[in-house]
Design a protein with these regions (language model features):
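Short glycine-rich hinge loops at helix-strand junctions in the catalytic core
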Residues: 66, 191, 316-317
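Conserved Class I S-adenosyl-L-methionine-dependent methyltransferase catalytic core
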Residues: 4-172
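Conserved S-adenosyl-L-methionine
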Residues: 317-326
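Conserved adenosyl
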Residues: 91-283
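C-terminal alpha-helical "lid/dimerization" subdomain adjacent to the S-adenosyl-L-methionine
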Residues: 271-314
Length: 326
């Protein structure tokens, strides 16, 4: 690239926060869903969303240039295939991801990235004076946004996990930190002889029943509330931790894995689903972005294979890994 091209590329990177907020605003207003039945004018959309029509038009025009919408005659807008991913109820929807990453708490925490870089501590508690869990317990709207994002991301990830690992010889599976059970339900639906245990904090699993009932797996799924740092359900064959370990520093990660190791049956195993920093291929921006996100939010991190081997009396060592498709 010449100097002008380099400047253009750097400009694009630095301006990214503006694009995020523009996408967030139209998603928060429900514009993509209003276009499910076909094109509509910005005046119609503004009237339905109680927005200022000229300002909404300017944002839609920007997002049209970014490839999320098309603009026809009389300023009538329609979604493109990429823009359709902002809609609810569609395959691969990223609606709740956008609402999460555009939400005010996420912006405040990333705005304090300098604090984390200078101190090595998560900026979340620096900004709010609370852990993420304490903050969401006191802010129901923020909790709802986060929970919807997690459910959506698990729904998008579950098919790849089910396809990547053969649970046919597994008799029992404990999903540690399994939330409301979306991933476990998907696994149980695929493997009809498998018995599962959903384990998470009591207030989290208290809301799992509707999803498990819709999946028709309640007869093969026990729901247990508790604190995994103290103990996990004992005497099961396999323990699954999906995107749990990356929340924590090495000390806490070892504690969680040790609890599972102590609880599992002889010859049992612990399965981890994590973003991995793969040292044998080009670095992948989404993984590295998630790594920095763990820094500011939780004090955790994404790890390489080698970093998943912790020294200690129980020799916590990573076994073979499987890379899920993009």
């Amino acid at each position: 690239m010449n100097d002008l091209q380099l400047q253009d590329e750097l400009w694009r990177l630095v301006q990214g926060f503006k694009m995020t907020q523009a996408i967030y605003v139209v998603t928060r207003l429900g514009i993509p869903d209003l276009l499910k039945e076909g094109p509509r004018s910005h005046e119609e959309l503004a009237q339905e969303t109680h927005a200022h029509a000229p300002s909404l038009y300017r944002v839609l025009r920007l997002l049209t240039a970014l490839g999320l919408f098309t603009e026809g005659e009389a300023h009538r807008f329609a979604v493109t295939p990429m823009g359709a991913l902002l809609q609810t109820g569609v395959a691969g929807s990223m609606h709740n991801m956008v609402l999460r990453f555009g939400y005010t708490d996420f912006w405040q925490v990333w705005g304090a990235l300098l604090y984390s870089v200078q101190t090595g501590q998560p900026s979340w508690e620096h900004v709010f004076g609370l852990s993420p869990w304490q903050y969401r317990a006191q802010n129901p709207e923020a909790a709802a946004v986060f929970d919807a994002f997690m459910a959506e991301s698990i729904a998008n990830l579950a098919p790849a996990i089910v396809a990547a690992y053969d649970f046919s010889t597994t008799s029992s599976l404990v999903d540690v930190g399994g939330g409301r059970g979306q991933l476990l339900a998907s696994i149980l639906q695929t493997y009809q002889t498998l018995h599962g245990v959903l384990f998470d904090l009591p207030h989290v699993v208290a809301e799992a029943s509707p999803l498990l009932e819709r999946a028709e797996v309640t007869e093969r799924c026990q729901v247990i509330g508790g604190d995994a740092f103290k103990a996990v359900p004992a005497d099961y064959e396999t323990y699954l931790l999906s995107r749990v370990i990356h929340d924590w520093d090495d000390e806490h990660a070892v504690t969680l894995l040790t609890r599972c190791q102590q609880a599992m049956q002889p010859q049992g195993k612990v399965l981890l689903v994590e973003y991995m920093i793969l040292t044998d291929r080009a670095l992948e921006v989404p993984v590295l972005e998630s790594d920095v996100n763990m820094l500011v939010a939780m004090g955790g991190k994404e790890r390489t294979d080698a970093e998943c081997c912790w020294p200690g009396p129980d020799a916590l060592t990573a076994g073979p890994s499987t890379v899920l498709p993009d």
